[in-house]
From Swiss-Prot:
Top enzyme class: transferase
Keyword Transferase appears in the UniProt entry: yes
Protein name in UniProt: Nodulation protein NolL
Record's keyword terms, sorted: Acyltransferase, Cell membrane, Membrane, Nodulation, Transferase, Transmembrane, Transmembrane helix
BP GO annotations: enterobacterial common antigen biosynthetic process
GO CC aspect terms: plasma membrane
Gene name linked to the record: nolL
EC assignment: 2.3.1.-
Annotated source species: Mesorhizobium japonicum (strain LMG 29417 / CECT 9101 / MAFF 303099) (Mesorhizobium loti (strain MAFF 303099))
Length: 373
């Protein structure tokens, strides 16, 4: 989701000139996933606002079963090059500049806007607590991706044993009895980051077994995902079970969560690849891949800010279901339009682009600045 690294996989779609052989099939998948993130939050914060009914919504469930795990798996896959080729200091430093710097900017913006409209003014302690909540909680996925990157980078120092150690770490982290802050969400997504990273390695078993019987696996995983979907409930979400096993029932929910997410993610990824093969030449597919898929960090930051500020709006009874759906549609489109406008403007403002968007300025702008200097 949050990586601008070229994918190593080939043959899933054509790449136009000037893209440096970037595999747009992954960008297409990321574009669809960030759209699902926005839709999922629209369901939670608008359609079902004020109730807990969204936990049982089949639409919410079908999205949350796989969208963040798959995002994390793609991030691990695309981060493989940076993890293996760059030094620890360089890799972590670049990832911090790419992820944490724009996140801090947007968290500060959210906190400033909320503080400006909330009266009376809070104490300094409450103010700092609110700021820390924005920094850690609002964009938890960024922290999960950043921490996962660091963990994998450290574990790769074990050379030949690193694959086995990374696999063991996925299990150890997933079942660690820790529930502090966003730790449950890290425990939930880290194994998928590891899986994505391992799939990027030239181990040989992917081509030998999985790809040879791909469609058999797809059918079996589709059946498994459907069964898990039927059993998925409120306590199956990592937000509620905290990925913590303390009795037989909690073990069942955690196992169902990981099994359902794994099966649904695999089926969804294969479906997106097949869809890309069929429609990659269309304008809609190119928009999803190039405009949305290559702007997922900015879209995630913008939608996070919008939905955090939605806490300031109270919907009355006049907001019936039809009105909410209409407003949600308009807001979803507005988020995309605003993000695209910010991207277009910020990329022309030099290093402001790194602070706001998390991406370098346009190459032409960098060249002109170097000539001036």
């Amino acid at each position: 989701m949050l990586d601008n690294i070229r994918a190593g996989a080939k043959g899933r779609g054509s790449c136009p000139a000037g893209t440096n052989n970037r595999d747009l099939s992954f960008d297409f998948a990321k574009g669809i996933l960030i759209t699902l993130v926005i839709i999922g939050h629209l369901l939670q914060y608008l359609i079902y606002q004020g109730t807990d009914a969204f936990w049982l919504s089949p639409y919410f469930k079908s999205i949350y079963m796989f969208h963040m795990p798959l995002f994390m798996a793609i991030s691990g896959y695309l981060s493989s090059g940076a993890i293996l080729r760059k030094s620890f200091t360089q890799g972590v430093g670049e990832r911090a500049m790419q992820l944490l710097l724009p996140m801090l900017f947007w968290c500060t913006l959210i906190w400033t806007l909320k503080s400006a409209v909330i009266f009376p003014m809070k104490s300094l302690t409450d103010t700092l607590l609110d700021l820390s909540t924005e920094v850690i909680g609002t964009y938890w996925f960024i922290w999960a991706a950043f921490i996962s990157f660091i963990l994998i980078r450290v574990l790769t120092t074990f050379n030949r044993l690193s694959i086995w150690i990374i696999s063991a770490s996925a299990i150890a982290v997933a079942f660690a009895p820790i529930t502090l802050s966003i730790t449950p969400l890290l425990k939930y997504t880290y194994p998928f980051y590891c899986l994505g990273f391992l799939f990027a390695q030239p181990i040989g078993w992917q081509n030998g077994v999985i790809w040879r019987y791909k469609w058999i696996f797809v059918v079996l995983l589709s059946i498994a995902a459907f069964i898990c979907f039927l059993g998925w409930g409120k306590e199956t979400y990592a937000y509620n079970n905290l990925v913590l096993i303390h009795d037989e029932q909690s073990a069942k929910q955690v196992f169902l969560m990981f099994s359902g997410s794994l099966a649904a993610s695999a089926v969804a990824m294969q479906s997106m690849f097949q869809c890309w093969r069929l429609v990659y030449s269309t304008r809609v597919a190119r928009f999803v891949a190039v405009q949305l898929g290559q702007s997922t960090l900015l879209l995630y930051l913008v939608q996070g800010a919008v939905f955090r500020l939605m806490d300031l709006i109270q919907f009355g009874e006049v907001w019936n279901l039809t009105t909410r759906i209409t407003f949600a549609t308009v807001l979803g489109v507005a988020i995309v339009v605003i993000a695209m406008a910010i991207r277009s403007i910020a990329r022309n403002l030099g290093y402001v682009s790194r602070i706001v968007v998390g991406a370098p300025p346009r190459p032409s702008l960098l060249k002109s600045q170097s000539v001036i200097n």
